[in-house]
């Protein structure tokens, strides 16, 4: 294979000319020496995105292009970007091209996989449906997660998406003991650092591989880092027959990075300035996240909602792929109820008596009915006051306010902020607690006793303390 020469540099995009008949294929990795990144030769990787004609390809750089000059030599590696996979990646932080960035030495593994891989064949996919317990009351009761499913955490800025993800990692590592892969896509470097330190302190780091392409990285890295992390997860699923958890924070940044490079690649923007290939790119990523006969990948994806607008093309395209949605609401966060999950807006495909059993389904529907009735009555209460309600409606409002407070829960990962020890609530306890509230067994208990409690027994202890 002959080497090429740089003919043009436009921000994160570089054009490279090769000799006739020597063009690298789409997605092949090219390497070039960038003195601004260090003295090592071939230290910048770029991925071929387009063939422009006249023996020229356009490639997206995975790191800074500052310092590149026209006429510089470019190496065709003859293969795609490949990342190390296997147990050697656990406890490590990798970047988009699979290099360790935690200063802990090289990754101890001999196997590397290319990051663009085919979707599992239809015959290899599993069709079994079962719920996946998280230990978080509002999730397990009202919008349960499916094993091997795709879950979206929707919310604007600062309502608690990252904290909820960290709590899930904590609960799953402690209770489930499986491997997790965390993809930090275009989020804050500080959060990435905090996550690593907290995982280390809570002893879950040795079960987790972290792959980061943070906010300060060029769009090429942010657009590909989710694929690198998914490849690490696929190895555990296909070769080690594991049930893997893949956390993506934040899937919106994957779309955003794609839109940043799309215009530079000469594509005409689509609605709201997004790339015309938005649904294709999203589909290629999401379809690889699935359960096969070997194992499963359950993915939890934080989805930033620009300006709290759920109809924006980025969140709307992601919706189509999800099995469950956990919607975080600013109104609920303002009430001081955390996790700020909206119990009426969040949904799940498996909220079905045939999957969960009749009792769980009935309690969930009863809780939703009480909360919806309270929501309907709020206009009347605001205009006329509580006194104008019928006795039955007053009772509904009282129960709804207790349910609302009982849906809050202290998190393990937030102990350092709140000083309250975190609680993992078993599903059977969650169902029992809400069933008793809906049936009116705790109508005499003050609503403040339900706030930030674990199970219903703790609520009764709180009430006894308040009474004494």
Curated annotation (Swiss-Prot):
Question: Topology with regard to the membrane?
Answer: Peripheral membrane protein
**Binding positions for ATP per the UniProt entry:** 155-162
Cross-referenced Gene3D superfamilies: 2.40.10.170, Bovine Mitochondrial F1-atpase, Atp Synthase Beta Chain, Chain D, domain 3, P-loop containing nucleotide triphosphate hydrolases
What GO terms are given for molecular function? Answer: ATP binding; ATP hydrolysis activity; proton-transporting ATP synthase activity, rotational mechanism
What keywords appear on the UniProt entry?
A: ATP synthesis, ATP-binding, Cell inner membrane, Cell membrane, CF(1), Hydrogen ion transport, Ion transport, Membrane, Nucleotide-binding, Translocase, Transport
UniProt-listed Pfam families: ATP-synt_ab, ATP-synt_ab_N, ATP-synt_VA_C
**A cellular component annotation (GO) from this entry:** plasma membrane
Q: Which InterPro entries does the protein's record reference?
A: AAA+_ATPase, ATP-synt_VA_C, ATP_synth_F1_bsu, ATPase_a/bsu_AS, ATPase_alpha/beta_chains, ATPase_F1/V1/A1_a/bsu_N, ATPase_F1/V1/A1_a/bsu_N_sf, ATPase_F1/V1/A1_a/bsu_nucl-bd
CDD domains named among the record's database cross-references: ATP-synt_F1_beta_C (cd18110), ATP-synt_F1_beta_N (cd18115), F1-ATPase_beta_CD (cd01133)
Q: What Enzyme Commission number(s) apply to this enzyme?
A: 7.1.2.2
Catalytic activity line of the entry: ATP + H2O + 4 H(+)(in) = ADP + phosphate + 5 H(+)(out)
Q: Where in the cell is it found?
A: Cell inner membrane
Query: What NCBIfam families does this protein's entry cite?
Result: atpD
Return the similarity comment: Belongs to the ATPase alpha/beta chains family.
Q: How does it assemble?
A: F-type ATPases have 2 components, CF(1) - the catalytic core - and CF(0) - the membrane proton channel. CF(1) has five subunits: alpha(3), beta(3), gamma(1), delta(1), epsilon(1). CF(0) has three main subunits: a(1), b(2) and c(9-12). The alpha and beta chains form an alternating ring which encloses part of the gamma chain. CF(1) is attached to CF(0) by a central stalk formed by the gamma and epsilon chains, while a peripheral stalk is formed by the delta and b chains.
What is the documented function of this protein? Produces ATP from ADP in the presence of a proton gradient across the membrane. The catalytic sites are hosted primarily by the beta subunits.
Designated name of the protein = ATP synthase subunit beta 3
Specify the species: Syntrophotalea carbinolica (strain DSM 2380 / NBRC 103641 / GraBd1) (Pelobacter carbinolicus)
The record lists the lineage as: Bacteria, Pseudomonadati, Thermodesulfobacteriota, Desulfuromonadia, Desulfuromonadales
- Provide the gene name from the record: atpD3
């Amino acid at each position: 294979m002959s080497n090429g020469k740089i003919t043009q540099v436009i921000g994160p995009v570089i054009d490279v000319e090769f000799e006739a008949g020597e063009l690298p294929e789409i997605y092949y990795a090219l390497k070039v020496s960038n003195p601004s990144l260090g003295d090592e030769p071939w230290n910048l990787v770029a991925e071929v995105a387009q063939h422009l004609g006249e023996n020229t390809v356009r490639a997206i750089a995975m790191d800074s292009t500052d310092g590149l000059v026209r006429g510089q030599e470019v190496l065709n590696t003859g293969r795609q970007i490949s990342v190390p996979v296997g147990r050697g990646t656990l406890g490590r932080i990798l970047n988009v091209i699979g290099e360790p960035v935690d200063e802990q030495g090289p990754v101890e593994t001999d196997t590397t996989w290319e990051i663009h891989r085919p979707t599992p064949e239809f015959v290899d996919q599993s069709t079994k449906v079962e719920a996946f317990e998280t230990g978080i009351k509002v999730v397990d009761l009202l919008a349960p997660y499916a094993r091997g499913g795709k879950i979206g955490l929707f919310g604007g800025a600062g309502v608690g998406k990252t904290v909820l993800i960290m709590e899930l990692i904590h609960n799953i590592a402690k209770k489930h003991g499986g491997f997790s892969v965390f993809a930090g896509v275009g989020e804050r470097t500080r959060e990435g650092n905090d996550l690593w330190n907290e995982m280390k302190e809570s002893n879950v780091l040795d079960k987790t591989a972290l792959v980061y392409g943070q906010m300060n990285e060029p769009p090429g890295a942010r657009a590909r880092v989710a694929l690198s992390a998914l490849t690490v997860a696929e190895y555990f699923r296909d070769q080690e027959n594991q049930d893997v958890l893949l956390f993506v924070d934040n899937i919106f940044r994957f779309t955003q990075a794609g839109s940043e490079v799309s215009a530079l690649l000469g594509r005409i923007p689509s609605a709201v300035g997004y790339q015309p290939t938005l649904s294709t790119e999203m589909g290629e990523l999401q379809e690889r996240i699935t359960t096969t006969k070997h194992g499963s990948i359950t993915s939890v994806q934080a989805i930033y909602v620009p300006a709290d607008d759920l109809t924006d093309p980025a969140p709307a395209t992601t919706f189509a792929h999800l099995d469950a949605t956990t919607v975080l609401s600013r109104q609920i966060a303002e009430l001081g109820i955390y996790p700020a999950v909206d119990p009426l807006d969040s949904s799940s495909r498996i909220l079905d008596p045939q999957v969960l059993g009749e009792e769980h389904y009935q309690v969930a529907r009863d809780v939703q009915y009480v909360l919806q009735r309270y929501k309907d009555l709020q206009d009347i209460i605001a205009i006329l006051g509580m006194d104008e309600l019928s006795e039955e409606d007053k009772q509904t409002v009282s129960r709804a306010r207790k349910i609302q407070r009982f849906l809050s829960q202290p998190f393990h990962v937030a102990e350092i902020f709140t000083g309250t020890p975190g609680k993992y609530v078993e599903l059977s306890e969650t169902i029992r607690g809400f069933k008793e509230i809906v049936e009116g067994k705790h109508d005499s208990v003050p609503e403040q006793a339900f706030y930030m409690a674990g199970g219903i027994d703790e609520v009764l202890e709180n009430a006894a303390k308040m009474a004494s």
